[in-house]
Amino acid sequence: MIFDTTNLENINSNNIQFDEATNLVNASLFYEHLERQIAQSRRDNSQFRIIRIILPDLMSELSLLDFASALNQSTRNEDVVSRIGRLEFVVLLRISQSTPDKSKDIIGRISDIYEGH
């Protein structure tokens, strides 16, 4: 009997990098992104912001998934949204010279999502 292990390797690789419940970047992959962003900032003098969000203990699993989805949808493709703890999320916002005000807009949207849950 012959097994195709390529699909299993892709599944295992994906599980290692993403949170199983929310499908957001997990803590270890977030810290890899953060290290790269710090190195890039040193090279080209770019900036970034980190937003840490801790949800209340009474948050249901469904509300948690809704929050994660809304959080992911409120950010840009170049930003990194991560679940690093049971009720803890972190967003890495990359700030460019051409669009510095975008980070403030994203922070406002994240605040609205947080207050809505």
Q: What residue ranges belong to the model's regions?
A:
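Catalytic core regions of nucleotide second-messenger enzymes
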Residues: S82-G85, I113-H117
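Residue-level recognition of strand-loop junctions within catalytic nucleotide-signaling folds
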Residues: P56, L92-Q97
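Regulatory sensory/coupling modules that transmit signals to nucleotide-handling catalytic cores
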Residues: M1-I11, G108, D112
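Conserved long alpha-helical elements within nucleotide-processing catalytic cores of c-di-GMP signaling
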Residues: I16-T75, S82-R86, P100-K104, G108
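A near-ubiquitous, low-amplitude feature marking generic local secondary-structure context
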Residues: D4-N7, S13, Q17-E20, N72, ...
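Generic signature of intrinsically disordered, low-complexity segments enriched in small/polar residues
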Residues: T6, H33-L34, I51, L92, ...
